[in-house]
């Protein structure tokens, strides 16, 4: 579906659910969210349309949360960008992108390889919220109201994002029962369980709970198997920054409605869209709703039961 098809009442491009007037006339907002113990509990993840869980230095992960269909009163903690964000933001057209910390080296790929408008806490702190109940450097949070206002000041846009995935209410033909999924990273674990209505997330052995007391949930869970390249860059602790390659192809596992479809993801170039295919070349459709994508290094396989 093209972005032009995102009209009020029509399918939202990032969820497949009916679109609101506000969502039909604004770009996506990407936000870099921390995902280590010091950042917990996080906020706003259950209002994100799509969340990408991405490997970073030290075997941990960091999130790129994409907001569009809902207004959100609080999300975070917001942290620094990584090179892979540019490749994902390119899928969202003229998006806004919020992050904090890092260096101009982190910002380079965003400005060079995406059409996103960056909003950096270090430069414009007035667009962000500081919460004292989290320790430094996990205190920076945001709201859609403040960041959309900031984005409009910098790059006025009424263009919604193109669709990243396809959506359909019907269950894919040939889907197998699979109610539990674990994505094991080098130093982090994301585990999902189907409860009959949605997938609930555990992280590193504990229920993944948010500030509002809800457990992280999703309508769909997608596990993408990707190659990971050494960027040669190092973080402030001297640890090498990895680059998960989300341009190319690899295995994919799609979980919806307590079922699984295995196939292939394909994105042949930076400008190309992301496609999910079954083994016989049919498009894999997600259930309308919110989606988490576990971007898992191809040296590991998801555990499924």
Segments predicted by a language model, with ranges:
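A surface/extracellular/periplasmic glyco- and lipid-processing/surface-interacting theme
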Residues: 7-48, 57-305
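Short, low-complexity, disordered segments immediately C-terminal to signal peptides
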Residues: 1-7
């Amino acid at each position: 579906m093209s972005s032009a098809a995102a009209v009020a009442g029509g399918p939202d491009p990032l969820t497949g659910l009916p679109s609101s007037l506000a969502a039909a006339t604004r770009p996506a907002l990407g936000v870099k969210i921390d995902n280590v113990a010091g950042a917990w509990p996080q906020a706003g993840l259950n209002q994100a349309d799509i969340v990408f869980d991405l490997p970073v230095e030290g075997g941990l992960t960091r999130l790129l949360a994409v907001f569009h269909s809902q207004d959100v009163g609080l999300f975070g903690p917001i942290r620094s960008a990584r090179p892979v964000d540019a490749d994902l933001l390119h899928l969202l057209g003229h998006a806004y992108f919020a992050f904090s910390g890092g260096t101009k080296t982190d910002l380079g790929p965003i400005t060079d390889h995406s059409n996103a408008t960056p909003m950096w806490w270090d430069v414009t702190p007035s667009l962000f919220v500081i919460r004292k109940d989290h320790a430094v450097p996990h205190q920076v949070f945001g709201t859609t109201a403040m960041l959309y206002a900031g984005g409009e000041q910098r790059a006025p846009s009424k263009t919604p994002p193109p669709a990243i995935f396809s959506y359909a209410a019907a269950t894919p033909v040939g889907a197998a029962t699979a109610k539990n999924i674990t994505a094991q990273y080098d130093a982090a674990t994301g585990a999902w369980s189907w409860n009959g209505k949605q997938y609930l997330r555990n992280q590193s052995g504990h229920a993944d709970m948010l500030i509002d007391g809800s457990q992280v949930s999703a309508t769909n869970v997608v596990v993408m198997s990707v190659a990971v390249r050494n960027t040669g860059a190092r973080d402030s602790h001297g640890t090498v920054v990895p680059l998960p390659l989300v341009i190319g192809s690899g295995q994919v596992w799609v979980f919806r409605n307590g079922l699984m479809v295995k196939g292939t993801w394909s994105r042949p170039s930076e400008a190309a869209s992301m496609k999910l295919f079954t083994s016989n070349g049919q498009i894999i459709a997600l259930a309308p709703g919110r989606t988490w994508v576990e971007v898992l290094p191809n040296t590991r396989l998801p555990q499924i039961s």
